[in-house]
C-alpha cells in the first residue's frame, strides 16, 4: 500500500488518546516513529565527513522534517497555532500529550464517567445486539486507553443481563 496517499488522523483537541493511538500507527507505517524518541539526534556533521556520515545525516534530517510535517498536518488550525513554533517532532508530541492527555486526577474522572456510562447503558428495542455490543466495547476500550483494566467478561456479563 502506498502510505503517501493515506491522510493522517486529524486531532481537534478532543479524544486525545484515540488520536494518539492512530497517529502512532500512522507514523510507524511511514517509519517515522523513532523521531519521537528522546535520543533521536540530528547533530551537525563533523569536519570532513565521510559519505556514510553525510548520507545518515541527510536521512535523519529528512525523517525529522517528515514527522514534523505529519504532526502539523494532523491537527486542526486551533491546535496548530499552539504548536507551530515548536522545533522537533518530539517537542510537538510531548506538548500535545501534556496539554491534552490530562493529569491523573482528570484521567480518573474520565474513567469514572465512562464506567458510569457503561453501567447505565441499556439495549434499546430497535437496537441490534451487534450495535449494542459495539457501543459497550467502545466504552470499554476508552477505559483501557486511560490505563484502567476492563475485562471482556464484564462486557459479556452486561450483554447477557
For the regions a language model picked out, list residue spans one by one.
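N-terminal Lys/Arg-enriched interaction segments
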Residues: 1-161
Amino acid at each position: 500500500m502506498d502510505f503517501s496517499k493515506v491522510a493522517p488522523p486529524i486531532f481537534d483537541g478532543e479524544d486525545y488518546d484515540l488520536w494518539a493511538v492512530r497517529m502512532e500507527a500512522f507514523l510507524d507505517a511511514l517509519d517515522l516513529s523513532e523521531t519521537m524518541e528522546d535520543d533521536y539526534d540530528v547533530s551537525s556533521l563533523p569536519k570532513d565527513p565521510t559519505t556514510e556520515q553525510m548520507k545518515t545525516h541527510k536521512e535523519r534530517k529528512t525523517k525529522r522534517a517528515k514527522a514534523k510535517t505529519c504532526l502539523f498536518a494532523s491537527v486542526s488550525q486551533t491546535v496548530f497555532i499552539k504548536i507551530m513554533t515548536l522545533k522537533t517532532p518530539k517537542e510537538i508530541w510531548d506538548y500535545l500529550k501534556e496539554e491534552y492527555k490530562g493529569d491523573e486526577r482528570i484521567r480518573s474522572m474520565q474513567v469514572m464517567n465512562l464506567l458510569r456510562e457503561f453501567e447505565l447503558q441499556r439495549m434499546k428495542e430497535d437496537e441490534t445486539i451487534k450495535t449494542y455490543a459495539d457501543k459497550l466495547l467502545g466504552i470499554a476500550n476508552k477505559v483501557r486507553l486511560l490505563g484502567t483494566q476492563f475485562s471482556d467478561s464484564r462486557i459479556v456479563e452486561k450483554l447477557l443481563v
